[in-house]
Amino acid sequence: MTRAWFVGLLLSCAAILTACKVSYSFNGSNIDYSVIKTIQIADFPIRSSYVWGPMGPLFNNQLRDHYANHTKLIQVKRNGDLKVEGEITQYQQRNKGVSSEGYSAQTELSMTVNVRFTNTKKHEEDFEKQFTATAVYETTQSLSAVQEELVTQMVKELCDQIFNATVAQW
């Protein structure tokens, strides 16, 4: 009886282990690569009235690089299993803090992108939403002196937000 019980337990464990699928990801993505193999990332045009020239290419390249570095998805020009598209809708600066003399002490720079995400294999995950990133700098500095650094910082934050919403699903 002990031997039959042991064999039954062993067969049950084997059946459970082969029926269960465990997937570990150390990069934050939550992708079933047996179903999702490709991603299509369109260029995001700038639709903002205020523009900094390098912002568009910087954003588009960083977004593609983010997916390339953090997933095994193959980037394609069309018919991707996942599709990420949208536009840069806002880039602006506004006074943030006031000094004791009544003048602006800090300026906030913000960037907003509208994203349309399509999962052709699981349409219930499709969405369209806006993501915003901000950065603050002292008014004693000129925008031209800090713009590249701040836009790069905001682009990284936006790419993280988009990645998390699309494939990490946090």
Enumerate the predicted regions with their spans.
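Second-shell loop/turn segments in exported
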Residues: 45-52, 141-149
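Surface-exposed short loop/turn segments
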Residues: 27, 69-74, 78-126, 134-145, ...
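Sec-dependent bacterial lipoprotein signal peptides
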Residues: 1-20
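A structural "domain/chain start" motif
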Residues: 16-61, 65, 72, 164-170
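Compositionally biased, intrinsically disordered linkers/stalks adjacent to structured regions
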Residues: 147-170
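Generic solvent-exposed, charged/amphipathic alpha-helical segments
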Residues: 60, 64-68, 114, 159
